[in-house]
Amino acid sequence: MKRYERLADQLIELIKRGDLPPGARIPSVRTACRAWGVSPATVFRAYYLLENRGVIRARPRSGYFVSQGPIEVPQASPTAPPDVDPKAVNVSDLVFEVLKTIRQPETVPLGSAFLSPALLPIARIGKSCATVNRTACLASMVDGLPPGYEALRRQISLRYLMAGMTIPVDEIVITSGALEAMTLSAQLLTAPGDVIVIEKPTFYAALQAIERLRLNVVEISVDPVKGHDLDALARALQQYEVRACWFMTSFHNPTGATLSDSGKQALVDLLAKHDVPLIEDDVYSELHFGPHPMRPAKFFDRNGLVIHCGSFSKCLAPGYRIGWAAAGRFANRLERAKWMTTLSASMPAQRAIADYLEHGGYERFLHKLRRELAQQQSQMLDAISRYFPADTMATKSSGGYFTWVTLPDYVDSIQFFLAALGSGISIAPGPIFSADGGFRNHVRLNFGYPGSARLDKAVATLGALCADETRCSTRLSGPARPH
């Protein structure tokens, strides 16, 4: 018997004896680790086993409680209609467990949200950093105050122009990463208790930001092939007083979906009809595999309602945390919000990136990076097809560095995550990508780490673990459901 199974049995005995009556809160993960001398992964796995059996149930942000009776674990559909009342967001503790795994150097970081440092121009960025530090004076440090270093904003404006868009320098606000740009945008557009429309699934950091802002969400499904369900969005806009939408329309994280140009035009027109702003997360736009970049929704904006948020963290310098917002009519308010929060993004980082964009061969680097990522995606998809169960599906994206994997519907991705972690591999389980913990048989994998032999071995291990989890799930819940 495995350690987590023994721990689960011990808790069942406590429940049977009445030490933990129905409705009682069971020990927190941290308390259980101390009491039984086990790791957080062991406790999580024991608790999820008990949850699957209906012995305990989770309450968001409160912990686990002994059930009054058996509960059924929902199997969420990636295209489930969103016609439900707005709800508060409570980010699972599992998100933070996933984030911890990517910091462990011995772990294969397929659950990471970042590219491998081996793919980035670290030495060339370092040269730019050294150059600007030699020439900078203390008085120039104030040049980075909101709206940000003008030379950097000019370079960003130039890149918009190269993409066929005219974005004035005065509408660009530099932030400490794109997440801050989007969070500040949501903050200035809403008040606690307001309704915001988000994607399902969506990036877990968006959920964390929305939880901090105490907003209620309506989730709109994103199909890996078709993109966003605009019919569902239209119903939500008619039914609720929506203050903003927060969408990623190109190379969506985690599904890889891209909304077509006609879809983006329809999205912008629909929101303009209701005078609802769009916070557009476009951090992967530079990582397109085709000959031309994808047009963002901002391209079709004629009313200044789209706040277009970008970043250099995903494709150039993650540690510098430099992002921006092309904020349209909201630029002055966003600049003021930046003043009142973190004040300024790092001035040396702003200057270094501006220097690199002007002198460092950014386009040559991106051309090489795109080619490498396209090859690595092909390698990962090939490995998944060879090693995973036959009814596994994985998305092929036209950019970015994620694939969204649909496992057999009787596989629990949280159990799979814990098993993978035990084998030294980090993955991102589906439940962290939605407000209600759905997508229990989905995982996100990162193909942004080079090394075909290491990648192949890791995917082979995951495939074997998936087969084991399939058999385990079958033993726990009975025969697999027919397809």
Where do the PLM segments sit?
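N-terminal basic, amphipathic alpha-helical segments
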Residues: M1-A130, E335, W339-S346, H367, ...
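N-terminal small-domain helix-loop-helix segment of the aminotransferase-like
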Residues: R3, D83-G177, L184, E358, ...
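Conserved core of the PLP fold type I
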Residues: R134-H274, I279, S285-N303, L373, ...
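Conserved core segment of the aminotransferase class I/II
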Residues: R302-R371
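Conserved PLP-dependent catalytic core of the aminotransferase class-I/II
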Residues: A354, L366-T392
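AMP-binding (ANL) adenylation modules
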Residues: F433-G437
